[in-house]
Amino acid sequence: MGKIIQLQEEERLRQGKNLLGFSGGVDSTALFFLLLEREIPFDIALVNYHQRAQAKEEESYAKELAHRHQKRCFTLSCPLGPSNFEHQARLERYRFFESLIHQEGYARLLLAHHLGDRLEWLLMRLAQGSSLSTLLGFSSREIRLGYELIRPLGEITKEALYDYLHQHQIRYFEDESNRDPKPLRNRFRPLSETLLKEHAQGLLQSFRFLQEEREILYGEDPRIRRDSLFYFPSQERETQNLHLIDLSLKALGYVMSQGERQELLKSGFCVVLKGKVAIGRSERGIFIAPFERVIIPKAQRERLRIAKIPPKVRPYCFMAGIDSLL
């Protein structure tokens, strides 16, 4: 008999409709069946990037599971090139999920990140240099524009998920890219797995303590998000502003170096980072968005100015059809 897996925010999941980001891998497949066991209402969404030979089979498996268990299954075909794949895949994935959430009336998005993912992130950030604001990575619950993002497996090891699937003889797919030694995360994975085998409870308790301390230090998240635009009112302390910018950049797949943090402070929070991300500040607050080069027609440019959206962020707002604050 395997250990009973406790889902975080379980009672909250029973309130309203849930959308599960599904891939057919160990994590999301385990979460699929754990939600079924608890009779928590959910549907699934899968993005097929056509990067792996088994991608078509994974999509078929998702549709089969959904049909068998009377769930809706939304799929998106999204071929991407190899350049900056992880970043682009993340943007497309969240764009797809959020469009479904708003169109179909889901209350929350469920993702299957687990304790190993949290430890890998922490190790990477320690190696690269990080403050507490970005050291912990994701939280079990985040408030987004119009929905909640919840990670029910945030305190569960991947080993426990394997045990659960094997015990119940549930089919799943292994992501071949996890064995690629090029991504930094994959190089930390063997160390993370060893640490969790020997010190899982101690590491989990440390994450809980650090999370509590981060909440005391930085308070609640005041950010508003629309597509890939983040906005929040300027905070009293610059450390709070930096923390919220760090979180927003992470969501866009970008992690600032120490030099870039200094540049950001010197600029008064008005800078473009490596031609990828634009940060601007106005009397309305601080804005973060992907950097775009586009000529904005005069009428739209004036609307963005009146809305007090900073110049460096305006091209993205124009491209995304955002001409006022929410």
Swiss-Prot record:
Ligand binding (ATP): 23-28
UniProt keyword Nuclease present: no
SUPFAM superfamilies given in the database record: Adenine nucleotide alpha hydrolases-like
UniProt KW keywords: ATP-binding, Cytoplasm, Ligase, Nucleotide-binding, tRNA processing
Pfam families: ATP_bind_3
Any one GO molecular function term: ATP binding
Enzyme Commission (EC) number: 6.3.4.19
Subcellular localization, as worded in the UniProt entry: Cytoplasm
UniProt KW Transmembrane keyword: no
Gene Ontology terms: biological process: tRNA modification
Catalytic activity: cytidine(34) in tRNA(Ile2) + L-lysine + ATP = lysidine(34) in tRNA(Ile2) + AMP + diphosphate + H(+)
Gene Ontology CC terms: cytoplasm
Family label: Belongs to the tRNA(Ile)-lysidine synthase family.
Task performed by this protein: Ligates lysine onto the cytidine present at position 34 of the AUA codon-specific tRNA(Ile) that contains the anticodon CAU, in an ATP-dependent manner. Cytidine is converted to lysidine, thus changing the amino acid specificity of the tRNA from methionine to isoleucine.
Domain-related comment: The N-terminal region contains the highly conserved SGGXDS motif, predicted to be a P-loop motif involved in ATP binding.
Identification of the protein by name: tRNA(Ile)-lysidine synthase
Gene that this sequence comes from: tilS
